[in-house]
Amino acid sequence: YMMGKYSKAAVLLAELISIMKGTDKAEESLFMVGMCYYGMGDNETASHYFTTYYNSYPRGVYAEEARFYTGKSLYMAVPEPRLDQTATVKAIKELQLFLEYYPQSDYSETVHNMLYDLQNNLAQKEYETAKLYYNLGPYTGNFNYASTSPDANANNYESCVITAQNALKEYPYCIQREEFAILIL
């Protein structure tokens, strides 16, 4: 582990966990397996091991670090804003839980910065959605539906404004604030 051979260390430490179950060595091994996967860049597996650690050892020696690295691993696994943001929401929840459990932690500032970035990801997704409505403009889709529907006068500009207004309410400190205001006008 100390030499950076994380894949070998992960295999050996995983075996130690089952052999040493119930001892301090199993606790340390479980945390170190998470760190191995984190070091290899396998963020989802790392977050799984860190979650297992703090659920198994809530008052363990590495409980604070495990919660932090769970959130950080999920943060690192977040997709770009144009994709599904379920992972972003999961990372936000985990980081907020960390702040609830450890408000005075040395990691607090880092966690706040990660939360800010994740909120901006969600705001960017909303901006792209509003921009799509704006670009669609008065397009109503199916001609037959448009001529027979009582909502035929409704258009995508209204959807753009509503999406932008909702995004400003939900993410008031986002970096896209000015762009949302332009779309609303």
Question: Which sequence ranges carry the predicted segments?
Answer:
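Acidic, polar-rich low-complexity tracts and alpha-helical solenoid repeat scaffolds
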Residues: 1-185
